[in-house]
Amino acid sequence: MTEKPFPDNTPPDAGERLAKRLARQLNCSRREAELYIENGAVLIDGAVVEVLSTRVHPGQTVSVAPGARAEPVPPVTLLLHKPAGFTVGDGQPSAWNLLTPERWQQGNTPAPLKMLSKHFQNQEPLLTIPIPASGLTVLTQDGRIRRKLTEDALFMEQECIAQVQGRIVQDGLQRLCDGTAIAGKRLPRIKVSWQSEGHLRFALQGIFPHEIEAMCAGVGLELVGLKRLRIGRIALAGLAEGHWRYLQPWERF
């Protein structure tokens, strides 16, 4: 028995899919047409369109930017200065809502030729920090970055500033450096120093930011704020809170 094709319920006046129109116009495959669209190289009546599901009407003009190529958009990595209280998981307020053109901090470093909608699809957060914490957050589409930050997570140094209150126990700073015990687990030696009154600087290796609260509690301190400044060789630097930038091709964790 031959199956009936799935019915096309699209209203007749909804127009034609952009990729179909473009493929016919350029005499190329539908996939090549989609790649032109994803690269931000397709214009409808002079306006750039990157949404594959876009439909066009016969009277509209579809054009392709000069020099455009039908190539896959290379994966990118985004660096976000996450504000305290924002989450990269489920829930609100969502850090994903901060990834807007208005919050793109370009600075003085070269950036990709142009920002594309494709850059914000299938981004994966890595080495996340607790929701109450702020600071450097990494989101990537790049499998090489994903492997690096996953496989080398225990060896990657992370620098954090912990805002604390309370009275530290005698030799508490040395105990933090020597590696305290949490839930029966002995933590490795790390570098901890006073940055200023009420602020401890942690250089973590083999320890993750979410463990700092228990470490502080073990020496009589209450953690009231946490900010991650650096992961490996990538620092927060001048990235403003709530803003983001692209990881540049020459930068390495």
Where do the language-model regions lie?
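Basic, flexible Lys/Arg- and Gly-enriched helix-loop patches that mediate nucleic-acid binding at interfaces
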Residues: 2-253
